């Protein structure tokens, strides 16, 4: 049983074979639960629709930093309403992205802070997108008291110091495809160091496919390859890692089955 804590199965890349991808993940790779993440008004809607269709798929709703420029003040009320949906178990993804120059940094920060405040109001954990913005992400999480709700730094790309700062605020560390890349020294180091009770597995599919599918469309079933790599790095059976990380996901997102 594996919990893939970050998917985008509503992405157009899956329009031709979405049901088959989900079936394959369940039956061939042992993925029992998936958290599908919406990141703007369009993808939030389709993410919830997908979660309503499958009892083992949940949804997160939020505004991605690269889409922050599209955020309107009325969207906060929209997110607040959706936070009460029974299949919505987290807010996000939210955060900062300094790699893609699509939204000004000050706009990203404003939208990020608004979502953290909403998460504290509705008491849902948050999913953090952090690209080339580690220090600013941690600073905002600290200043906005994100420790009150916790969450996950998805597709974690920071170093040990950033990891420790996140752990101090009740956050989990999400690891995906990059940990399988041959020269990915830092992700492999983090995979060894993160405490077992704070580790989550993810794919970010259709993006960031693990080896040997790097550069191709990622699938949620490939989270099994991520689990195998991390289990090898930590020197434990993959079944044990799957159990540990699934328990962690259930605890963070308050999912009971």
Model regions and ranges:
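Mid-domain alpha/beta scaffold segments of enzyme catalytic cores
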Residues: 1-257
